[in-house]
Structure formats: structure tokens, C-alpha cells
Amino acid sequence: MLERLEFIESKYDELSVKISDPSVMANQSEWQKLCKEHSEVENIVLKYREYKKAKEDLEADKEMLRDKIDAELKEMVEEEIKELEKSVVDYEEELRVMLLPKDPNDSKNVFVEIRGGTGGEEAALFAADLFRMYTRYAERQGWHTEVMSANETDIGGFKEIVFMVKGNGAYSRMKYESGTHRVQRVPNTESSGRIHTSAATVAVLPEVDDVDIEINPNDIRIDVFRASGHGGQCVNTTDSAVRITHLPTGIVVSCQDEKRQLKNKEKAMKVLRARLYEKAEAERNAGIAENRRNQVGSGDRSERIRTYNFPQGRITDHRIGLTIYKLEQFLDGDIDEVINGLITAEQAEKMKEMGNTKD
């Protein structure tokens, strides 16, 4: 680990010199690339330097104990040694985590697809609750959201809604939301007070560049139609809505939120590109050992990941067995406690995996 950290620090120093060089700065694309590399390792290097400083201080204190010093000073030094020894261990643990392989998509924007599942109108209302929860979470993170397409019901639910979340590290946190979300509550239409169970599925897809996924124009069919609102009534007098069908895979994407057909086509192509990327990734990962399917953050949308129990005010994340009792705050976007727990669990799995590899 130390050799790798030394190499990273050396690389960081080289990059620091380069990004300060006027001749490099003249080439903006190259300079931005180097700045990105520099920022990616900066936190590791700063933490490594704190670790080295703690080790140096620890050695200095141990050296002091070897000399003849008075009892009071000796007691102070011994106490400081205990604190520094703990700091060194903590730094080593933090550095191990920081050196874990990163998901290449973590820094990307995301598309989030929410669909009402079993439960009819109640499931559609729950899908709307999840949409609000994620938009509130995005606000807390300083991210921006943009609706790509929505199929709204007459009473304010969503049969399906697709939206984009733009912001640094959006995928790194939102990816843990992929899966089936289950809700247990008494619907407003239920006169007997009986608890109903409904579900909604969430898929989180990283935004992909044109270079990541190439789409042959001959492989798509584009249909245009008039945008419709609640109950199917027409809300536009021009054919501005767009439906794109990818013929080889049968994937269909619709977008009607914009007034201009060209804008709807651009949005639909972005979503199609993300879905094709997800499909390619799923096929690529199909050969990976079965045990990896059970890991945290596998992103399997068929997996039941979380239950929202309204009568008890409870949220349970089944992947890590975490239960918290603050349903109202959670649905208002205060979801970091669960996401942080999922990140920690995934890091622990990666550490274990690396340990097994070494064996």
C-alpha cells in the first residue's frame, strides 16, 4: 500500500507542476484533462501526508521517551503516543478505503426512471412520492433535476416518470436506489383502514457520451405525435412529442415534455443511449461470479431493496438490514443515513474481496 501511495504522491507533484505551466495552460483541453487527474488524487495525497506527519510525530515522541525526562512530561508524552497510535491506525484504514477501485461512472449525471408497479393507483401515487423524495434530495446536494418524460394519472400519481439529475457525483450516490421499493400504508380511498402493500421500481442509469454508445441511424425508428395530458387529452396542437424505437433491441423511449419536437428528440436520444449502455453493461457482467449479484449496489431493478411502512413510520433497507424511524424526513429527501450505510457496506465487501484475492 505504501509503495502505491508514494507513486500517487509523486504523480500528484508532477501534475501540480504541469497545470501551473503556461505552455500547458495554452492547450485548454489538455490542461482540463490534467486538472481532472490532479483533483482525482488530491484527497488521497493530502490524507497520505497527514498519515506521514502522524507517523513522524509518533517516532519523535518515542525517541523522547528514550531520553531521561521528568515524570510529568513523561506522562504527557505517553498520552500523546496513545492518541497518535490510534490516529495512525485510523489513517491507514481511511487510505485503504480511498485506494479501493472506483466506479468509472461515479462522477456522471444520471437518468432516474420510476414506474408504478403492483398496486394500481396507489403504486402510481407512491411513484410520485419517490420522485418528490429524489428531487428534494437533489436540492440538498446542490444538484439540478430535469424531467425527461412523465405519464401522470388523474389524481397526481405517475405510471412512469423519467428525469435527469445533474451534479458532481450524482451517480456515486443515486446508483444505490435501483431496485423495487415497497410501501405499506392505508390509501386515502380505503374506508375500512386496511393497510395495502404497493410497489414501484427505480432504475438509475449513468449519462453516457456519444463516444460511449454509437447508435446507427438505420437502427432506430422515430415517430412523432401530439403530446397528451391527464386522461389522454391533447395539450398540444402540433406533433411535438417523439417516440424512438431501437429496432435491434426493441427498446422504446418517448418524450413529450418540451414544446419543440427537436428538443424532445434530443432528450429521448439521451435516455435511449443510457438504456443501451445499461443493457451492454448487464450483458458484460453476466459472466461474473454469481455471488457478485448479491452485493450491495448491484443495481438489479427486480431486487426488493427497501420497505416504507407508514403506520410504524419505518424505513427498512433490506440489503444491509438497516431500519430507521424517520419516514417523514426520509421522504423529504433526508436519505443520506441509508446511502452512507450502503456505501460503507460496499466498501467492506470490496476490502474483503481484495483480501481474498491476496490469499
UniProtKB/Swiss-Prot annotation:
It is found in: Cytoplasm. GO terms for molecular function: translation release factor activity, codon specific. Methylated by PrmC. Methylation increases the termination efficiency of RF1. The modification N5-methylglutamine is found at residue 233. It comes from the Bacteria. The keyword Membrane does not apply. Belongs to the prokaryotic/mitochondrial release factor family. This is Peptide chain release factor 1. It comes from Clostridium acetobutylicum (strain ATCC 824 / DSM 792 / JCM 1419 / IAM 19013 / LMG 5710 / NBRC 13948 / NRRL B-527 / VKM B-1787 / 2291 / W). The gene is prfA.
